[in-house]
Amino acid sequence: VYLANRTAAKAEALAAELGCNTTTNAEVAGRSDLIFLAVKPQMMEALLAPLKFTLNERPSRFILCSMAAGLSIARIQEMAGEDYPVIRIMPNTPASVGAGMIQYCSANVTAEEEQEFLKLMAPAGRLDAVPEALIDAASSVSGCGPAWVYQFIEALADGGVACGLPRAKAQEYAAQMVLGSAKLVLESGKHPGELKDAVCSPGGSTIQGVRVLEEHGFRGAVTDAVIAAYNKTKEMGKG
């Protein structure tokens, strides 16, 4: 495994953590079978432009793997100069603890190469193949979603602190609750609304909290956040 970064210190720090080697972008482009393009969309063209010759001169097959939001496979191929095999992925931060949700789509990739890719990525979490037309929408839910969940956990902890809980305990309880609730949704196969109703006893405290969230537009705000993220992703892809 080879790592390259425009800031050498960052590459060296990550290499020390993972037990990898550091090198240059050109060296990665010339030697690696699977080349991860981990830059922001607006930086992709500047990254690939000086690598076109190196990629074109390679005698062996390779795959470009892009995680740049909004950039289509066709656009990546255009920037790289040829219709190279490309896998486009949308990871999220929970992948760093093996609990990610990663969507992917590909072009000019063989079934065997796809299986090798899935085997490599499996430790990061769940992977799901989607049509490229849906990957920006998927990213807006699971790619951006962790930030909103962190906000929710923080807000829950704030509420717990306001009611007298120590900060560390409030945060632990909130985070474990979110983890367990998500696990129940995935493993039970039940609709989230059904699971919500099961917690809300008639005249109880939970339904009063649900009422307050509805009064403040909680559901609509979350939906609007996803749509706003989706629109921004589409905008970045045009830049």
Predicted feature residues:
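Small-residue helix-packing motif on alpha-helices
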Residues: 1, 11, 44, 166-174, ...
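NAD(P)-binding Rossmann-fold cofactor-contacting core
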Residues: 1-17
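Rossmann-like NAD(P)(H) cofactor-binding subdomain of soluble oxidoreductases
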Residues: 8, 17-18, 26-102
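Short acidic-hydrophobic, aromatic-tinged amphipathic segments that line or gate anion-handling sites
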Residues: 21-26, 128
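Internal alpha-helical scaffold of NAD(P)-dependent oxidoreductase catalytic cores
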Residues: 75-85, 101-138, 149-187
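Short pre-catalytic strand/loop immediately N-terminal to key active-site residues, enriched for Gly-Thr
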Residues: 86-87, 135-140, 192-197
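NAD(P)-dependent Rossmann-like dehydrogenase/reductase catalytic/cofactor-binding core
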Residues: 175-239
